[in-house]
Amino acid sequence: MWVRTTVTIRRWSEEKSGCNHERYPRTDITRLPSWKRGYPASVESSSDMSSFSEGENKETERCCWKHQQCPVHIIHSFSDCGHHNRCMHAVSHCNCESRCQSYRPISVAIFHHPTHHMYMTDDLNDLEANQLAITNNLCSTDRPTDPNSVESTTGAPDLSAPITIWRSASPIDKCQEGKVIKNIKKKKKEKDKEEMMVDEKPKLKKKAKGKLIKKKSPMKSESSPADLSHSISPRELVRTSESSPDSREGLESEDSYERGKERPSSEDIVESSPKKKEKCSAQAKKNATKNLQTRKTSKRKSPPVPNPNLS
């Protein structure tokens, strides 16, 4: 994500008060790019340069850090030279006691281009050529079009106006990034679990179907009912049918139904009681007559007993 930032630095300009220090010609300043040329101005800087005083060359360039930079020398950011600290460093040192005492700070805006080149030598001509090529590319895209901003080489730049710079950076803090990463990992794990569950469901269904088929297979392997009727006698079939719970329930239901039919109601019992008495009396008479007849026939059929006296 691209984040808009502004960078302002302080530069030392020559004071109007007369001094006997050695002055450098204006031609040295004109050798620098237009956006790095320093011109005297009456605007004091409101920015604090303490943030720029930390870096790898703090001890070696303490003089330049203390008094900032003379307009003759070139300022480079560490990111341009392969370093990644938030500070500035000078290509060549300056004699602060003889040169920088007559300068005061003013605000100057510079570009921090995102390209990283190898830090080889301190040749000013090579560095200027590289910087000019970079600034030409940046001016077409990154430089603002407002009239209040820094102007091109033809006009005097407004040194107090900062230049907007676009750089790539993350809009989220490290702690927030960690939370976001954890949430993403949790979501991924939940998705993986859901996919695993979806994949396991058809497998479980297939396993259950396989178990049911295995249970049904021994029943199919047995002989058909037609074969059983041929091999088993009808008595055994009746016994098996009676022994089965379904047949027992059917028989019990049929018996109970028939018993219910045989049992007469109370009215039928009252009506049939005199008839039964008459029938019973008639049957008793018939039985008595039959008994008498049988006795008579038995008496007739019995042979005569021989009398021993007659013999």
From Swiss-Prot:
CDD domains: PLA2_group_III_like (cd04705). InterPro entries: PLipase_A2_dom, PLipase_A2_dom_sf. Transmembrane segments: none annotated. Keywords: Phosphoprotein. Residues 203-218 have a biased composition (Basic residues). The keyword Phosphoprotein applies. Residues 139-159, 184-311 are annotated as: Disordered. GO terms for molecular function: cyclin binding; phospholipase A2 activity. GO terms for biological process: arachidonate secretion; mitochondrial protein catabolic process; mitochondrial protein quality control; mitochondrion organization; phospholipid metabolic process. Residues 191-202, 245-266 have a biased composition (Basic and acidic residues). The modification Phosphoserine is found at S224, S256, S265, S266, S302, S311. GO terms for cellular component: mitochondrion. Residues 139-155 have a biased composition (Polar residues). The keyword Cell membrane does not apply. Belongs to the PROCA1 family. This is Protein PROCA1. It comes from Rattus norvegicus (Rat).
